[in-house]
Regions:
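A recurrent flexible, glycine/aromatic-enriched loop bordering the glycosyltransferase active site
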Residues: 156-192, 387-388, 396-403, 407-430
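N-proximal low-complexity "stem/linker" segments adjacent to membrane-targeting elements
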Residues: 1-44, 255-291
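Glycine-rich, basic loop-to-helix element that forms the pyrophosphate-binding segment
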Residues: 77-94, 115, 340-352
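Boundary detector for helix-to-coil junctions that initiate low-complexity/charged tails
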Residues: 452-541
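Short aromatic/hydrophobic "clamp" motif used to bind/position activated sugar donors
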Residues: 99, 360-362
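Conserved donor NDP-sugar-binding/catalytic core segment of glycosyltransferases
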Residues: 111-160, 368-403
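A conserved acidic beta->alpha catalytic loop
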Residues: 61-68, 106, 314-329
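Short, acidic, metal-binding catalytic loop of nucleotide-sugar glycosyltransferases
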Residues: 43-54, 298-307
Length: 541
């Protein structure tokens, strides 16, 4: 069965209690100084609906004092300590086709193992996550009470894995979650894995004392796993975990370890110029002409994304110190590349790297990515959650010259499901998606004819930065001139307002004077008219 990205909705698990299991499962329980809760965990496992002849349990005693006691198989960790080391010891001893890791403070419902295993019968690369209900009982039940019935034994706590349930709910039960997010819900308190897949990706990192689930979830993603949370695989968690009791302290402890190992947590890698144990992008350049390879590597290392490691592949074992003509050496280009990059910690002279980084960029020698080319390509692939970006660089008589940005999770998934005779890119397109883009649109250019140039050309990002600075300077000058002009206009406007007020006052004076004069004139005219009338009427007077 082929699953696209994390969309396990193409699978239809059987209803609980209606199917016939065939796969074997080993339940691994890491335990440290927790005999009382472990007894309840084991009692709940004794009452599982999954066939007992297909289920075995391994308790791993992580240095308990007094030592843990249990009826079944016990593995005691002596050379290391911590939960990761305990789970790894249990994995090494496990014989089941599936390994279900269950913490010693978990009390699973009777259908818990069955709910996990019904998925594993459908596809061989699923990681199934149980559903946790927290409880803080005033007094724990006895193992006999647990074996008799788990579902209603405990009062439900108000605490939940809100952040995980929110991610699951917002992404259609995790089916539409992007690759960079999906493994965040990997909580190892109840999780099951194909044993072969867990071993193939390296098992637990025993050097980690906390955050081991986060780191393992990341590596499982790169191995091509599909994560399936099943709300019917329920279990009680007795008490609150450290993640809920000491949030700030746990984050402070985990951040540097997670930052070094999980490139997806970009917010933890905000430090400029830092290098990390696991790079964000593994770039691969095949050895060839010294000038071509150097130009490509220089472009990759000078990019805006510093979280890049470059591997130059070639027959490095051919380089010996036997006598030769230095200038006529048939391996001269290879030797020059070795001399140029052997002491650069960001460059490896080796075979192609294993799939640990989330992205791999294959760049043909002689082609130089621009300052932000790699960063923009990764952003494009993350936006679409695609599997491969094929970057068309040039067309030649031999075909199209391309660079490729590949998602490691997509390559691993395709390798798991490809059939003989199939074309890899066809399978990649089916399980994640393949997209073609124009290299010129992403800043790829052919190297200069002379490389390295005697005078280094100004990098594009510096040229653009200077251009922007010049434009800003011009705009600042223009803004200053406009401010001065506005100030002058304000002054003139204020003067205009004063003049207007003065002229209004004069106009009012003139109006009053005109009224007065008009009245006087009218009075004079009237007086004359009266006199004229009188003289005409009374001529003798």
């Amino acid at each position: 069965m082929r699953i696209r990205r994390n969309d396990f909705g193409v699978l239809t698990p059987p209803e609980l209690g209606t199917w016939e299991p065939t796969m074997t499962v080993t339940v691994v329980i890491p335990a440290h100084d927790c005999q009382e809760t472990l007894d309840l965990t084991l009692a709940a496992l004794s009452a599982q609906t999954y066939p007992s002849h297909l289920l075995d349990v391994i308790v791993v005693d992580d240095g308990s004092d007094p030592p843990i006691e249990a009826a079944g198989e016990i593995v005691r960790v002596r050379e290391s300590w911590g939960r990761a080391a305990a789970v790894q010891a249990g994995l090494e001893a496990a014989t089941g086709e599936v390994v279900l890791v269950l913490d010693a403070d978990m009390v699973p419902h009777p259908e818990h193992v069955e709910a996990h295993l019904r998925w594993h019968h459908l596809a061989p690369y699923l990681v199934v996550l149980g559903w946790i209900d927290f409880t803080q009982p005033p007094s724990p039940p006895t193992p006999a009470e647990v074996a008799a019935g788990v579902r209603d034994l405990f009062p439900m706590s108000s605490h939940r894995h809100d952040w995980a349930e929110e991610i699951i709910g917002e992404h259609d039960g995790l089916r539409s979650a992007p690759s960079s997010l999906v493994s965040r819900v990997h909580v190892g308190a109840t999780a099951s894995y194909p044993a072969w897949l867990l071993r193939a990706c390296g098992g637990m990192d025993a050097s980690l004392k906390l955050a081991e689930d986060t780191e393992l979830g990341y590596r499982l993603t790169q191995a091509g796993a599909v994560f399936v949370p099943d709300p019917e695989a329920r279990a009680w968690h007795l008490g609150l975990p450290t993640a809920m009791r000491s949030v700030a302290e746990l984050k402070r402890y985990n951040d540097p370890f997670v930052a070094d190992r999980v490139p997806y947590r970009r917010y933890l890698r905000a430090d400029q110029g830092r290098q990390w144990l696991v790079p964000y992008v593994d770039a691969v350049v095949e050895a060839g002409s010294y000038e071509d390879v150097r130009a490509s590597v220089d472009g990759l290392l000078a990019g805006s994304l510093p979280d890049v490691r470059v591997t130059i592949t070639g027959p490095w074992e051919w380089l010996t110190d036997s006598r030769r003509s230095p200038l006529a050496d048939p391996l001269l280009d290879l030797r020059l590349l070795h001399a140029q990059f052997t002491h650069d910690p960001r460059v490896r002279l080796a075979d192609p790297p294993p799939g640990v980084a989330p992205f791999r960029l294959i760049c043909p020698p002689g082609w130089m990515p621009g300052h932000d080319s790699v960063e923009r390509l990764v952003e494009r692939l993350e936006e679409t959650d695609g599997g491969v970006l094929c970057v068309a660089l040039a067309e030649t008589p031999d075909g199209v010259v391309t660079a490729r940005l590949e998602r490691t999770a997509a390559l691993s998934r395709a390798a798991l499901v490809i059939r003989p005779g199939e074309v890899l890119d066809d399978v990649l397109d089916e399980v994640f998606g393949v997209e073609w883009v124009d290299g010129a649109d992403f800043g790829f250019t052919r190297r200069p004819r002379l490389y390295p140039p005697r005078r280094r050309p100004v990098p594009e990002h510096e040229r653009l930065a200077r251009q922007r600075e010049q434009e800003l300077s011009r705009l600042r000058e223009r803004a200053a001139a406009l401010r001065a002009e506005v100030t002058q206009l304000r002054r003139e406007a204020a003067k205009g307002r004063r003049d207007t007020a003065r002229w209004k006052e004069k106009a009012e004076q003139w109006r009053r004077e005109a009224v007065r004069l008009a009245r006087e004139r009218n009075h004079t005219v009237l007086t004359r008219a009266v006199r004229r009338v009188r003289s005409l009427t009374f001529p003798d007077r």
